[in-house]
Every structure is written in structure tokens, then in C-alpha cells.
Amino acid sequence: MQPITAQGRPQATRGRWIWVLSGTLTIAAIGAFGSWAIVRASNSPGGPTPFSAVPTRTVIVTRPVTALNVQSYGAPIKVTTAPGPVRIAESVTYDSADGGPPTVTDTDSRGLLTLAAPACTNANCSVGFSVTVPSGVTVTASASGGPVTVVGTGAADIDSGGGPVYAAGIGGPLTVTADGGGVTVNNAAGADLDSGGGPVTATGISGKLTVHAEGGGVTVSRVPTAAIDSGGGPVYAAAISGPLTVNAEGGGVTATGAGATQINSGGGPVSASTIQGPLSVAAEGGGVEASGVTGALNVDTGGGPLSATSLTSPSAVVRGEGGGVSLGFLTAPASVRVDTGGGDASLSVPGGPYAVTADTGGSQESVLIATSPGAASSISVTTEGGNLQIGPA
């Protein structure tokens, strides 16, 4: 069966059909298990001009499509959803000195539709695609420089060679690899995001979120669990209902409203608040601020100061290399161990008595709470020269 066109006529060339179009092309199904291939040429009357865009060409695919593979070189890719057949709009730009417009191919085999312009990998041209597919279609998109937008599809795998990526309403797992452009994701079933330098923003992820960013900032919110690796940019995480892990090479880290949280900072400051579970922080030099931690507190400041307030932690272990430590508890902890490495230490705890041991290295020591050597709750503080104060909350 020949393909059908409403506005245009087929011309045979080298055993394949080239469609000279002025409007819309409708491709009919060839057979239940067959495949089709379409090659288009310019529809500009009088021929193209150097570096000019061929008027947008639209194709309607009547055959069922379950998966889409789009490849673009230097031009945008946009995939959205709507009921009905697949619609493809192509925007072609090229240099007429190179011999004519690039070949654009569409091939389909067993429900997989592939859109590509292979000639543009080495030629001075670009082809952009704007595709409308039914919801649930899985998408693979690869762009060498142009922006990529995918909205409302099934699972998606996006590879961007530098342009920004935007994905929203993805009904299956989402994978994004971006070599420099920013990445923005709103609502996906799960996401694995890798950015070569651009910023990353992800919100409303219903499954696990994994982010690797070489240098751009990372902002995530409303996800059940997140693992973030930042090569230097700041990290902001909020409304994480489950575990949160952050490794930051130098940028600051802010976490608010999370489950069990582990933060490793290569130098930037750390702020953690409303942590519903244990909090573990290793900071190479930046200061640490924490509040509203309900689980065990474990902090190694590496030199920067630590201030932790509104704690209901059952235990706390703090190690510092010179920075001061301030801990404020709302409920009586079972065990507290602090070593400031030289900085001052200030603790406020409710109730008592506590079994208190302290070594200030000769500096001032003030203990204003009830103490007993055999008490069930214990506080041990070593300041190595810093002053110590323990008082009631």
C-alpha cells in the first residue's frame, strides 16, 4: 500500500518515496507486522535559501505507536501528549551550499517510531521535532545541543548534549543525562538525573530520586527518598518524606523536612531542620546548624561551629576540630558525647540527674544541672581548652 497524502504528490527516487509537501502528510498502516520509511524533501517554492528554515512540515501517523525514539542535532525536541494519532512537526535549517536539505527519516517497526536526521551529524544543518503522542508512550530522546521537552509520556530516557531539559508528568521511570544544560523535572514516577554542570531542579517525584551534578546547584522537593551528589554547587532539599543522602564537594547544603538524613560536605555550610529521624553530618570546614531533629544526632564539624536547637534526639555524638558547639534539647537525652577540639561547649538539657564527666583542659567549667554518678542519662564533654557550660533547658 502506498502512503497517502492530502496535500502533496509522491515522486519515486532510488527505490524510495520522496514527498514534496505543502501541508500535512498522513501515513497509513502497511500491515500488522510491517514497517514503513518516509523520506522528505524541501517544500519551499523556488528552492531554499542559505541557512534558512524550511517551512514546518507536519506528518500524521495513523499506525499505533507505543514507543518513540527521537534524535536531533542542534535543534529542539519537544514531545507532548494528546488523544488521537501521532503528529510530527519538523523544522529544518541547512546551508544550500551543501547540496540541499537534510534527509529526515521516520521508521516504524512493531510500534517503535524513530525520528532522525542522520546527515546532520556531520553537515551544517539541523532538524527539530515537535511530536504529539498518546499518553503512555515511552520516549527516548537524544539532542546534540538543542533543548529537550518531554511532557505527559510514559517512561523517558533523555540525553542532551548541552541544551536544557524539561520533563513533566512522566508516568514511568525517567533518566536524564545532560552535558551542561540545566535539568528541570516536575512530577515523575522516579528519576535518575545526571548533569554535567547545569543546575538541577526536581519536584513531585513519586519514586526514588538520584541526582549527580558536576557543579550546578541542586534543588529537590516533595520526593519520598533522594540521593544527591553535588560537585560544588549548593544543594537545597525540602519535603523529603523518607531517607535523604547528600554528598557535596564544596557548596552549601540545606535540608528541611526530611526523614533519616546523611550529609557529607566538602567545605560549605550545612543547615538541617525538621529531620524526622537520625541526622548524620560530616562537614570539612563549614559551620553546621540543626534544629528539630528527632533521631540520633551524629556530627563531625571538621573545624566549623555547630549549633543545634529544639532537639528530641535520644543521643548525640559531636566531634569538632576547634569550632564551638551549642546543643539545646527539648527532651532529656540518654547519652551525649562532645569533643570540641579546643572550642567552647554549651549544652542545655531538661530534667536530670545526669552522670556528667568533663575535661576542659583547665578552662572555665559551669555545670548547673542535677548530677549523679549512677544516673541513667550521661553527658561527657571534652573541650581541650575551651570553656564549658551545662545548664537546664
What are these regions, as identified by a protein language model?
Residues M1-W17:
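Terminal targeting segments of Actinobacterial cell-envelope proteins
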Residues R16-W36:
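Hydrophobic membrane-insertion alpha-helices, especially the h-region
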Residues S35-T114, N122-T140, P147-D159, P164-G169, ...:
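Short linear S-[DN]-x-LW-Φ motif typified by the pepsin-like aspartic protease active-site region
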